[in-house]
């Protein structure tokens, strides 16, 4: 009996470590992806290096800060552990340097056109990766921090973690938030949220998280490929 209990404890600890490691990966992916997204919009708006840094950082940590305020984890994680802030700052500077180097050679119309296509593709990729990673991370953080199984709370915090940074980014850049336009954006989050919430009751949490992450990616790319949009 004691051996069985001992094995169960170790199994639970192993699962917790796996989930924690996966969430750390999601956190890094989301931080880099959203920092790229924010930095690129700042470049498009012809901001200076400081503006690029601000938009990169805000896009990266903004959703997580809102999440922490909602669930009562204060001060927000971005102040308790500045890892994401540092990652997003470095990413923003790297994006700025790459853009400056590339911009010196983008003189012909053909290269300028190619640059514009590359900009939109990279923006879509980074935004989608950040959206998927932070949506699942927001849900998992809520479940663990509040020890709750309330779907509406978990779903709301997951959604706001995913889209919050992008909303702040767009407002600072003087644009209508992307999530409020016709694009399949928050809708993709909802599919991932529902998938993760259902599956984590039946399969290992890290597997449920990966499937939820992939669902967000899949819906976003299918929407882009088939030009799905919400009516307006």
State where each predicted segment sits.
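Structural signature of hydrophobic alpha-helical transmembrane segments
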Residues: 19-31, 77-90, 149-162
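Transmembrane alpha-helical segments of multi-pass membrane transport proteins and ion-pumping complexes
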Residues: 31-39, 60-61, 65-69, 88-101, ...
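Double-stranded RNA-binding/processing signature
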Residues: 41, 49, 70-71, 75-76, ...
């Amino acid at each position: 009996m004691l051996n069985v209990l001992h094995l169960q404890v170790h199994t639970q600890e192993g699962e917790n470590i796996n989930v924690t490691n996966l969430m750390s990966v999601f956190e890094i992916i989301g931080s880099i992806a959203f920092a790229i997204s924010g930095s690129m919009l700042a470049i498009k708006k012809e901001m200076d290096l400081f503006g690029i840094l601000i938009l990169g950082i805000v896009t990266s940590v903004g959703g997580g800060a809102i999440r922490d305020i909602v669930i009562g984890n204060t001060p927000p994680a971005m102040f308790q552990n500045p890892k994401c802030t540092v990652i997003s700052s470095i990413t923003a500077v790297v994006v700025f340097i790459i853009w400056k180097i590339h911009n010196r050679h983008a003189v012909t119309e053909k290269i300028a056109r190619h640059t514009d296509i590359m900009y939109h593709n990279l923006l879509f990729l980074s935004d989608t990766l950040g959206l998927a990673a932070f949506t699942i991370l927001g849900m998992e953080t809520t479940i663990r921090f509040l020890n709750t199984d309330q779907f509406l709370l978990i779903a709301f915090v997951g959604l706001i973690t995913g889209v919050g940074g992008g909303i702040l980014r767009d407002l600072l850049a003087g644009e209508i938030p992307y999530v409020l336009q016709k694009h399949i954006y928050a809708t993709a989050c909802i599919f991932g949220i529902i998938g993760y919430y259902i599956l984590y009751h039946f399969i290992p949490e890290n597997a449920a998280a990966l499937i939820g992450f992939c669902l967000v990616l899949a819906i976003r790319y299918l929407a882009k490929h088939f030009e799905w949009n919400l009516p307006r």
